[in-house]
Design a protein with these regions (language model features):
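Short, low-complexity disordered leader/linker segments with a strong preference
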Residues: 1-27, 325-327
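Pocket-lining segment of extracytoplasmic ligand-binding domains
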Residues: 87, 167-261
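Secondary-structure end/capping motifs
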Residues: 225-307
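Conserved C-terminal helix/tail region of periplasmic/extracytoplasmic solute-binding proteins
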Residues: 297-327
Length: 327
């Protein structure tokens, strides 16, 4: 009898220990700037269960632009935002105390492609005297486009017109509707326009721009402070996905993320993933470097939206501790 009771007690203790060791599931409301193959590592983390392994339930919404993602984070409608870190710079320079802080980087160059109306050998000189639908003024896509144009001797506003009046998620529709001569589009939209016979992919903006912290994860300081464990678990999942995508080819990646893009065939999705692999779009780890942030601020200064005196110190805007712990 005594031996039986000891066995029962041991079993109960094992159950209690297992229950104590089990991680509580937490829900994270994540607002992404757009739903694009450009963010493939994030979808790998979702589809491979990397977030679930960290005890996280992700509620993903499409913010439809960096400004809208930032608004969602600032108003508490989203816990974490995925957008260009320029949004954090703008908020910091507005003097807000609880300005959002970047804790992880996903992409390291522009993920948009220049789409034109004719299938011709591309030269930036083709833009002279033409109109390019470039996105919202002050957004990283528009600023990077202008930076690349200047780098190639085409001055926006003088040699070519950059239309900044069209909302980010309306750019493809505006172009296929007859506006502009060129447009910058992310995947899968660029390929969808090309497949519809409404345009031709001519150039990669990111290949021309060099490395910048194009898309990153950020949250309010209050959220990070109150939910440090969740932020670490989130970053762990992203780091694991970045490693996974580096070790697998485009076809394998396309198979995994296909549920996120139900309107695309796997062969076309494979082609799109390969296009991003070819331009080295994704970070190897979530760590952001000081030099890359400074290049972004250079792009912003060149675009006329940031004075040099208003550059934000790296250590104020970026907390790499979670990324280092995850990598």
């Amino acid at each position: 009898m005594k031996r039986f009771l000891c066995g029962v007690l041991a079993a109960l203790m094992l159950v209690v220990l297992c229950a104590c060791g089990k991680q509580e599931t937490a829900t994270v409301r994540l607002s992404e700037v757009t739903h694009s193959v450009f963010y493939a590592p994030q979808y790998v983390a979702l589809e491979q269960g990397f977030f679930a392994d960290e005890g996280l339930n992700i509620e993903l919404t499409n913010g439809g632009g960096a400004d809208k993602v930032m608004t969602a984070v600032l108003t508490g409608q989203a816990d974490i935002g995925l957008a260009g870190p320029e949004a954090c710079i703008y908020v910091y320079n507005q003097g807000k105390d609880d300005y959002p802080v970047v804790f992880g980087q996903l992409t390291k160059r522009d993920g948009s492609f220049l789409v034109g109306r004719e299938d011709v050998p591309f030269s930036w000189e083709l833009l002279r005297g033409k109109t390019v639908i470039g996105g919202r003024a002050g957004g990283v896509p528009e600023m990077t486009l202008e930076y690349v144009m200047r780098q190639n001797g085409v001055v926006p506003g003088t040699d070519a017109t950059v239309d900044t009046t069209v909302q980010f998620n309306m750019m493809a529709g505006a172009f296929t509707g007859g506006n502009g001569d060129f447009v910058t589009l992310f995947e899968p939209t660029a390929t969808e326009v090309a497949q519809a016979g409404k345009g031709y992919i001519l150039a990669s903006i990111g290949q021309e721009s060099g490395e910048i912290p194009y898309t990153a994860y950020f949250a309010s300081q209050a959220y990070i402070s109150d939910h440090a464990d969740i932020v670490q678990r989130f970053t762990n999942a992203i780091a694991r996905a970045q490693k996974w995508i580096a070790e697998h080819d485009a076809a394998q990646t396309a198979e995994i993320i296909a549920p996120q893009f139900p309107d695309m065939s796997v062969p076309v999705l494979t082609q799109v993933v390969q296009r991003y692999k070819d331009i080295d779009a994704w970070n190897a780890t979530p760590v952001m470097t000081r030099s890359s942030l400074e290049r972004l601020e250079t792009v912003m200064e060149t675009a006329g939206v940031l004075d040099h005196a208003d550059w934000v110190d790296f250590d104020r805007l970026v907390d790499n501790s979670y990324a280092h712990n995850a990598s």
